[in-house]
Amino acid sequence: MPVVVEPPNGSVVTDVVGSAALPLPAEFLGGAALRDKVVTAAEAVRLIRDGDAVVVEGFVGQGFAEELTLALENRFLLTGTPRNLTAVFTVASGDRKGRGLDRLCHEGLLAKAIGGHWGLSPALGKMAVGNRIEAHNLPQGVVSQLFRDTAAGKPGLITRVGLGTFVDPRNGGGKINERTTEDRVELIMLNGQEYLFYKALPLDVAFLRGTTADPEGNITMEREALTLEARAAATAVHNAGGLVIVQVERIADSGSLSPRDVKIPGVLVDCVVVSQPEHHWQTFGTQYSPAFSGELRRVRSTIAPMALTERKVIARRAAMELRPDSVVNLGIGLPEGVANVAAEEHILDYLTLTAEPGPMGGMPTAGLDFGSAVNSQAIMDQPAQFDFYDGGGLDAAVLGMAQADRMGNVNVSRFGSRLAGSGGFINISQSAKKLIFVGTFVVPSRAHVADGRLVISDGIVSPKFLADVEQRTFSGEYAAAAGQPVLYITERCVLQLTPDGLELIEIAPWLDLDKDILAHIGFTPIIKGTPRLMDSRIFTAGLMGLKDDLLAMPLEARFAYDVARNMFFLNMEGMSLLTENDVEAIGTEVEKRLAAVGKKVQMVVNYDNFYLAPVLTDAYVTLVRRLAEHYYAGVTRYTTSSFMRLKLSEQLSQRGLAPHIYESRQEAMNWHEK
């Protein structure tokens, strides 16, 4: 006897498979049933087989198909099937209290897991660390991009992301435990350069989420905070002959959805499930905010300043490293405070803040809302966001730091039996043009601010700066070889990465170098002379005046001379030359400083965010020619702007000057050292 399934929108699908209600493949259906893919969650998950690899989409709680996950858990608890599944995820969604992927952590349900971030699903992490399942931890961006490459039928992904870290096969290949023997990462050589090859993902089922579906399975995402890699995952699973199930809030009439709004076309979708509202929160922290989904822009209100604690001290010092017109990624946790400081100091409008799952611009959110943004300029698909990151699109990144060692390696992914996972950390840290790690100096901090001073209390602490980190999530050696500028900012001191290891460059005023700093470091840092004192403003209540610092660097602060290499640095970043007096002023100051050196120098000039009024081009190039003839043994220039490189190169070449213009400071310096 046919079984009648009444989907939530009242449409009817029939099939004749015994007494079980199962949606049939389209080629077996006819008439109206050919188009109607709406079923219940229980019916959808009954198609999952033992041993299937299930994509569980989500970021914290955004995009997470909770209705489907609960249905799968309930089926297993009632029937004992399906068994031995593989969970595949970029981020293991969760709230650390049992929601998210932790719902699937029953003995026998999972056999394997492949994912980027694990920290929000502690039960899943315990299964992996406890050797109860096979488990790989790969970079979040790599997993995200693998959905796209797997969809295209490629054998995998080739990238430099992960070299020198724990996912490098020379350091374990991302295997979490002894039970895991499968190699998913290979070291390869291309044109004399090392790369990592990540194998395509095994994919049989996808749990995805949208806002609206029509009976044909076309999916829109207008109320979602993120789009993540939903379309890529759906394509990958569909092309593998698998099952794509999408959880939505509502059903629209057939043909009523605008094709421009459809994020997942119906040809990729097998089942649509209308969720109960309580299982379809926009994030795990907020049921719904139209500001997160970009449906409206929130009126900018005054953001309450952070309390003046050691965390604000660190965030303030990190904010001092930001430059106007920079594209920045802020990590979760302490780095979130940098956005608060930027808002308080009125410099948000001069920065483009981003988050790895997709938001571009706006104000990043925090806590269980993390990953979304208010008033963003765009919401990118996650693979595209990581393309932007991996290709060098980030001017700066501020990331957390749980452990660091003498060579500048950083661990944020694993601490004994606790598994956090790498998340997007490896992609971001390896690719940002400037990297700023932030964290308290020891645990617990034992520091507080009183009367404009940092005060250290007595008590037992655990060091965070160790001889060697437990796991290498960031390779200091790789970064140093690439010439990447890296700072390690704490409330007590600031260190920087050098080819020889970490150098202590700043300490907080009033602290004792031996007692308060060196006694709590597991190695002897490089110290050249006396470390500078950290800016006293970061310990003082009230505004620091960071906007003035950001927009108006004094001319005298734009010069530096490296005696050992006879290399002179001129920082023109953010300068605007609008009048002939501006050109004369910079020329006079440069000539004065170069004349004082007493010999010709190797000149390196930073042209990031530089503007020259077109009518001043001849006057400026005449100045450059005069300086080159009298003071330069050689000169190189650099800017991250491809347009500026092209324009400057044309203007100099047309006037008979060799441009020698590069994308990075390191490339410009390397030219002189050949």
Where are these regions (language model features)?
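Conserved phosphate- and dinucleotide-binding cores of soluble alpha/beta proteins
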Residues: P2-R46, V60-F76, V88, G94-L104, ...
